[in-house]
Amino acid sequence: MKKYFILCLLFFGTLSLYAEKVSLKVYNSFQIIEVNDVLFLGYGNRVSEIKFENDVPNVSKIILEGTAFLKDYSFISSCKNLEVLVMNNITVDNFDFLLSCKQLKVLALDSIKCNQLPNINEFKKLEYFALTNSDLELCDSFINHGQKLKFINLSYNKISKLPKLNSDDNSLYFVNGNLVKPVEQKNYIFCDDISKNLPKEFMEYIR
């Protein structure tokens, strides 16, 4: 029993040792929290500013939902090891803060209001991209992307026309719930049941 207790102390001590300190501004004061490799802010939070203590925080996953009070997302640019970014019900001007996140594998955006769409061709390691429920009308810019990107989810937007894909494009484009009528092209998926074509590892990012 004593040995087990010591092992537990060592385990939690290690977690604390490698935890990242994050300052969250709520109203007019900052509060400091510790996270390991995941930063999550859910609906109902009143955070208006986020700062990492380290210049290059070891955070691999960030989930932001309904951050109505948060306007500046530049803190994400310091996360050089970021692999997963999920943003739901958020307003942003642009996605320039992502340009330094070269390790990004998953970018899942839902109910986003923005003035400038992300250039997914910048992320050569990206495997799954989603921009859903965001009143998107044109999707031409998303057919130019890295070779590792195999799954592009553009469901439930206002797309009325689909671009012609390159002959060597093997990616799947999920376009169910749009204005466009189904076309006979294997890359475009109109089925509402995305799970039939999307690997399980990405299903957790479906809204």
Residue ranges and their predicted role:
Residues 17-19:
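Boundary at the C-terminal end of the N-terminal hydrophobic targeting segment
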Residues 22-28, 197, 201-206:
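Secreted glycan hydrolases and related glycan-binding modules that recognize and/or cleave
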